[in-house]
Amino acid sequence: MKDKQKRKKERTWAEAARLVLENYSDAPMTPKQILQVIEAEGLKEMRSGTSPLACLNAMLHSNSRGGEGLFYKLPGRISLFTLKKDAVQWSRNAATVDGDEPEDSADVESCGSNEASTVSGENDVSLDETSSNASCSTESQSRPLSNPRDSHRASSQANKQKKRTGVMLPRVVLTPLKVNGAHVEPASGFSGRHADGESGSPSSSSSGSLALGNSAIRGQAEVTRDPAPLLRGFRKPATGQMKRNRGEEVDFETPGSILVNTNLRALINSRTFHALPLHFQQQLLLLLPEVDRQVGTDGLLRLSGSALNNEFFTHAAQSWRERLADGEFTHEMQVRLRQEMEKEKKVEQWKEKFFEDYYGQKLGLTKEESLQQKEVQEEAKVKSGLCVSGESVRPQRGPNTRQRDGHFKKRSRPDLRTRSRRNIYKKQEPEQAGVAKDASAAPDVSLSKDTKTDLAGVNSTPGPDVSSATSGQEGPKCPSEPVASQIQAERDNLACASASPDRIPTLPQDTVDQETKDQKRKSFEQEASASFPEKKPRLEDRQSFRNTIESVHTEKPQPTKEEPKVPPIRIQLSRIKPPWVAKGRPTYQICPRIVPITESSCRGWTGARTLADIKARALQARGARGYHCNRETATTAIGGGGGPGGGGSGAIDEGGGRDSSSGDGSEACGHPEPRGAPSTSGESASDLQRTQLLPPCPLNGEHTPAEAAMPRARREDSASLRKEESCLLKRVPGVLTSGLEDASQPPIAPTGDQPCQALPPLSSQTPVAEMLTEQPKLLLDDRTECESSREDQGPTIPSESSSGRFPLGDLLGGGSDQAFDNMKEPVSMTPTFISELSLANYLQDRPDDDGLGLGATGLLIRESSRQEALTEAFASGSPTSWVPILSNYEVIKTSDPESRENIPCPEPQDEKEWERAVPLIAATESVPQPESCISHWTPPPAAVGSTGSDSEQVDLERLEMNGISEAPSPHSESTDTASDSEGHLSEDSSEVDASEVTVVKGSLGGDEKQDWDPSASLSKVNNDLSVLTRTGGVAASQSWVSRVCSVPHKIPDSLLLSSTECQPRSVCPLRPGSSVEVTNPLVMHLLHGNLPLEKVLPPGHRSSRLESSQLPLREQSQDRGTLQGTGENNRLAARINPGSAQTLKESILAQSYGASAGLVRAMASKAPAMSQKIAKMVTSLDSQHPETELTPSSGNLEEIDSKEHLSSFLCEEQKEGHSLSQGSDPGAAPGQCLGDHTTSKVPCFSSTNVSLSFGSEQTDGTLSDQNNAGGHEKKLFGPGNTVTTLQCPRSEEQTPLPAEVPPVFPSRKIEPSKNSVSGGVQTTRENRMPKPPPVSADSIKTEQTFLRDPIKADAENRKAAGYSSLELVGHLQGMPFVVDLPFWKLPREPGKGFSQPLEPSSIPSQLNIKQALYGKLSKLQLSPTSFNYSSSSATFPKGLAGGVVQLSHKASFGTGHTASLSLQMFADSSAVESISLQCACSLKAMIMCQGCGAFCHDDCIGPSKLCVLCLVVR
């Protein structure tokens, strides 16, 4: 016995099994049967803790392989083993039975081994064992047994197993998961196959295990294929060979499924697989890798030998089990996943509607043809994607192809977006919508997604006409956006007839210029490619900010249109939608946006305010240098930021793509120095924007008609677009301006060139002009779109803008006289556009003047000058100066984002633009920049002589603006604009800087913003006028610039606002303005209207001004008729004319800025006829339409103001009242007003302001009455009431309204708002203040404080009591502005006793709050910008509310009256959302957010090293 026991103990499994098989050699046995015999006969001692079956299984399998194996495993589904010696006999039987399953033996092996392994514990042993056994028994059952004994044994085993399984396997109900409400198609296969497989097992004895096996296969297949959805439709009625065992339904969904603990490899083998019905097998085989399936001679797929025995399959099975265990296949999770997938699909309904399996399918193209086209476009597509715009595509390809592709591409998305917007803004004429759409095409590349959504509806009609020419040509070339392209192509084809005339000519010319542009673009794109793509993704990633904005950014310029899904936000998108609104541009952008906004906000607001003041003073000291630096940084920021930001948006790439071709190419390259790659990108973006701003450049004479037509068409489109993306467009203008500044030289020519009038002047700078023209040509569409969108404040305005733009460009680009003449010719230009364009041009002109003076080298010079300016700023600026510059740099870094922001936030950009535009208007219109440039570079005799002081003063103003803008400079948007424009000024006036700096310092000393002393401004204006007269167009433009600057305290405010982009900044400038006013009797008198402008101005200027006044009067008279449409153009023309241009500029400036009152008065004094005319016009317009009312008096000014205010007010006015825009947007055609409430309203305010100003100065009663009427009308319009209140006081005080108006504007766009607010508020305050000269500054300050703290108003009501309650109330009503201003003011005018006294706690609290709320401030500011976008696009009230909210928030944060502000100002919660308080630490060092890479102030980012946005997100 002992021996027996010993033998039994020592006997191996192999020996025991051999004994069993020898004893029972009559038939093959399964491992289980062998084990039973072993156990029964005690052939081997079983040790506890081991799994005998597993061990036996493993031994049998291992010993049945190879030549030396003792055993032989019969091929088949069940592991039947026999001794090798008996193998022949059994193999024959098996062959007859199982011959058709050559793989069975392997499978059985695997099954056995799997069984062993499972049992050994890979999974739940019993479960695995059961399933393995079940599968084995199933196999045995399913396959005929060789003999009765076998069959009996098998059946008994199966029964046993069945019972066991019943016990062991939990009863799992297999509930089918439905994919999209339907079972997964057989193709996806698993569901069906599995379902059957699971459902029925061959013998139904172990259907459970079979089901498991099937499900496992399915799971595996799915895993391999990784389509979770496939698993969802597992269940299908049992069919085929397998019957379903209803007692055992397998759960394929929940983590509690038995399959979680099942070794799928044991379940899924060739045996179980072949047990499935053939069609299920085929479906499942499709899920396997190609290697693992073989095509049989019959064409059916077969498993390869190792298909189910390899790492891949093992891993897939394991991963499926893990996913099952994780609950991935539960219905809820599947629904969630489906939703996510659908979201990722991002195929809007309209896209689904127009969906094509391949590009061109609906056009009748074959797949091959489509593929060929795609291949051709692949590069372009990739590049376009990288560049965020069609831009890269275009540069890569030939100019034509590229442009078409880029254009088309851009158009596809922008157009789609535009169309979508158009959908929203169907009110606007389809044609205009089409143009706008086209205009937005470039800006809206980022918006394209949103647009595309609406596109389905809107696309079809408006988009086509605009993009038809381009799209028609490009249609096939846009494979990247097959659907959009097709749709666009179709639409374009439809619209081709209408758009073709304008567009096609443009395209050819663009093409001509494209070649040069292409190269420029290429360089730009390479840089932009690096920066844009990088930023674009960020934009997309962080579009949460913008989203407003492609975009926005735009895709979410307006919440309605642009949702945060603006990943493709292009520059325009960025401009259109703030990152926060849009998908969220890179936080870097966001922060920059915040920073830019913060920049203005920070500086303008609490900390920023104070810092801004410091900066402003430092800038004064630095003068031009600081400005140069600022401008360089700003330009870089705008260009770089705009480019990358906007580029990220896609607008830059879109428009920038074209722009970038010439202006951007060189400029981008040039500016990279300050900014590096982003700078290049940004600058490219800026240039692009600029070019966009200066669509005329492409005209270069050739394009004049087509370009003009196109711009007009675009304008029309833009009109609708503007409505849709007025914010976006505004931002675009800002971006454009930014771009203009960056691509100033080229853009200038383009601006003037559109009418071809600047072409001759451009001829002198032909290289630049050509580049500009090329750039604009490419950009023309985009730029035109942008411009038109900017101009599109009114449908009419767009056309006028188009004309005006060109003349502006001419002015800037060409000789001053020529420019003026040209401008004159395009009298129909919209003043708004001109102002906008002027601003842009002016900004451009400053660099462009460099370019002009330098000719072909203009671009390089401009770059160098910008660099020079930067250097100067660095060198000349004190630490304070550098801080602003640093801010600018930050802005540059943030500015890129801000630029992106700008791009996403046209309004802020617009504000910048406007801020720029004021000077630009002056410069552009009278070629002040050239003059500035002249004084700087090639001062003409007269220009130099009178430009010396003029330039100085202008520069001073500019510098002050720069300082102001510099203070907010960190806020990229305003910094970009203000910085750019001022930088340009500084650059241009750097040579005049010495005196200028002194002047600026003096002025700035009084007030950073207001250091644009009215008297200084006036003297500047006077000097400018004389310079204008002497220098002709250049001098005139300079004087205009001076006037703008001087008229502008508002201008500085505007600049400040734009530069601060946050109204707070603007407020500060206003206060400073008031301070200056108080300090400067001339200014005070001017503001009061006691002193005619002519008196302040030198004789030369006076005559010039009178001339200007008369011209504008004439033009305005004409305008009255064409006021809504050509009226503005006429004014623009008048402004463009040296004399009339000056007057117009004055008017525009006056209108644009609070100083307009003084300026207008001076103008009125100089040109009473004009004033009266304007007043009459205002009256007539007033009677005609509130909107019209303003136009007559300030057609140009209003237009400019309109642009500025549009930028600024768009939000504001939107908020302030849609009707306001309707009622008080005389500058904008009534249709325009309605169509572009944002635009119109802003112009209305501007108009009203101008009217008031003019009324005071010229026909105080008439204009005041008219203005009052306008104000009342505005009042009638609700939000306008506040404005009206202010306006009424304004007519009394002339500036209060502008001040109030700007507050409204800030709500729309912080930057524009700032501009407007700064200008308007400043003027308002100044004017008010000047009324009581001694109290004027304080009053203004108080008012400003109050204004900016409307919400603070409660807290500051005490102070408000000091000031006119009505005005304060009005301002409060125009809260956005007021609120914004206060923040700006406090930080901006810390030194100002009133400012701080008004908000003593406000400043510190603002600073602290800003720092604490930097994110909030920035966010709020950003939000307002983004909201402004939203409001500007469709909902005026919302924009206004947003602006107000943002302002109030800013003010509230600053004041601690957040609640009241938000409550009072923001019924519009969205506005509150968008409100982004700006950082109050503009002077603090900037550090990079660890989360998003955005640059923010150390205090803002704090120990967490995360910006507020990141913190909020986290």
Swiss-Prot record:
Residues in HTH HARE-type domain copies: 11-86
The annotated region (Required for interaction with RARA) lies at 1082-1087
- For the motif NEF motif, what are the positions? 310-315
Q: Motif LXXLL motif 2 in this chain: where? A: 808-812
Instruction: Please report the PTM annotation for this entry.
Output: Ubiquitinated by TRIP12, leading to its subsequent degradation following binding of N(6)-methyladenine methylated DNA (6mA).
Chief location of this protein within or outside the cell: nucleus
Composition-biased stretches, type Gly residues, lie in 638-654
Q: Which residues form the DEUBAD domain?
A: 255-364
For this chain's UniProt record, which GO biological process terms are given? Answer: animal organ morphogenesis; bone development; bone marrow development; cell morphogenesis; chromatin organization; heart morphogenesis; hematopoietic or lymphoid organ development; hemopoiesis
**Entry's localization field:** Nucleus
Annotated region Disordered: where? 95-170, 183-249, 378-543, 635-823, 895-914, 926-952, 964-995, 1095-1131, 1213-1234, 1256-1338
Record PTM Phosphoserine, positions in chain: 498, 500
Residue span of motif LXXLL motif 1? 284-288
Q: Coiled-coil intervals in this record?
A: none
Regarding protein family, the annotation reads: Belongs to the Asx family.
| Task performed by this protein | Probable Polycomb group (PcG) protein involved in transcriptional regulation mediated by ligand-bound nuclear hormone receptors, such as retinoic acid receptors (RARs) and peroxisome proliferator-activated receptor gamma (PPARG). Acts as a coactivator of RARA and RXRA through association with NCOA1. Acts as a corepressor for PPARG and suppresses its adipocyte differentiation-inducing activity. Non-catalytic component of the PR-DUB complex, a complex that specifically mediates deubiquitination of histone H2A monoubiquitinated at 'Lys-119' (H2AK119ub1).
Which named protein is this?
Polycomb group protein ASXL1
* Native species: Mus musculus
